[in-house]
């Protein structure tokens, strides 16, 4: 009998985790999902939505079976998260070296103007800080955000380190973009399954598979492949993000 199809939702603007080559979704996330759930006997349909919040809402409602996401108490209600993380992610402060930022603690950021993406969480402490001080400009896409940093319209960006570094490489003036070595927050990307999905009964199998992929080096290899492929494509296409 044909394999049962499961729906995986992605918003592919986070190389090397997920990105689009113009035809399909590429990167560590779709590769991992196809391998893992293929091995469990499923066919994977990739659903691309126009922003990250819509993926979260669709997973919560059971319209898609899974996403890759950070675990938060609010998300726990509707999503079952893998205990085994897919990847450690480090949110860094990016700045323009022509206007360096001096930051010892979170409070020091209040004196600078930041650029952030709608709908993103950057860790509870930082989110609270932003709510209190509010010295930020909100944008809907990273290209716009990093462009403002190059032109010194803003002083800093909070962004996942790997992704931000790849973005900066692509930009005219990007050689002036630097990241502070100290992470703002550290979080772990996990497989997040809708509690409405039959997959929610398979979390033990999912964890076992993730452990295997980590221990045999597969996750690191897929990540390295994605960085290489993205750089190669981005080098050939001006609009690649």
Please name every model-derived segment.
Residues 2-78:
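Extracytoplasmic small-molecule ligand-binding "clamshell" domains
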Residues 6-12, 82-104, 118, 191-194:
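Hydrophobic/proline-rich hinge and linker segments of small-molecule sensing/allosteric domains
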Residues 11-13, 88-92, 171-207, 230-241:
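Periplasmic-binding protein-like
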Residues 12-15, 26-35, 96-132, 137, ...:
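Bilobed "Venus flytrap"/periplasmic-binding protein-like clamshell domains
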Residues 27-39, 99, 107, 112, ...:
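Extended ligand-binding regions for polar small-molecule ligands
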Residues 43, 121-137, 175, 210-241:
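Ligand-binding clefts/hinges and TM-proximal coupling segments of bilobed small-molecule sensing domains
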Residues 45-57, 137-151:
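Short helix-initiation/N-cap motifs at beta->coil->alpha
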């Amino acid at each position: 009998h044909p394999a049962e199809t499961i729906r995986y939702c992605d918003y592919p603007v986070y190389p090397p985790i997920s990105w689009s080559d113009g035809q399909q979704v590429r990167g560590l996330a779709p590769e991992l999902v196809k391998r893992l759930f293929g091995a469990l006997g499923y066919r994977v349909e990739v659903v691309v939505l126009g922003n990250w919040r819509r993926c979260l809402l669709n997973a919560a409602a059971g319209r898609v079976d899974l996403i890759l996401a950070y675990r938060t108490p609010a998300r726990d209600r509707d999503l079952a998260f893998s205990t085994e993380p897919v990847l450690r992610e480090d949110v860094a402060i990016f700045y323009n070296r022509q206007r360096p930022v001096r930051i010892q603690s979170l409070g020091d950021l209040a004196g600078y103007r930041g650029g952030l993406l709608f709908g993103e969480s950057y860790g509870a402490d930082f989110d609270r800080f932003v709510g209190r001080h509010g010295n930020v400009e909100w944008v809907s896409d990273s290209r716009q955000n990093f462009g403002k940093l190059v032109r010194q319209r803003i002083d800093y960006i909070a962004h996942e380190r790997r992704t931000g570094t790849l973005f900066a490489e692509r930009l005219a003036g990007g050689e002036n973009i630097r990241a502070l070595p100290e992470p703002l927050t550290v979080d772990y990307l996990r497989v997040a399954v809708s509690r409405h999905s039959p997959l929610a009964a398979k979390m033990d199998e999912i964890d076992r598979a993730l452990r295997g992929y980590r221990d045999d080096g597969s996750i690191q290899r897929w990540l390295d492949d994605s960085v290489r492929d993205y750089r190669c494509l981005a080098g050939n296409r001006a609009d690649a993000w």
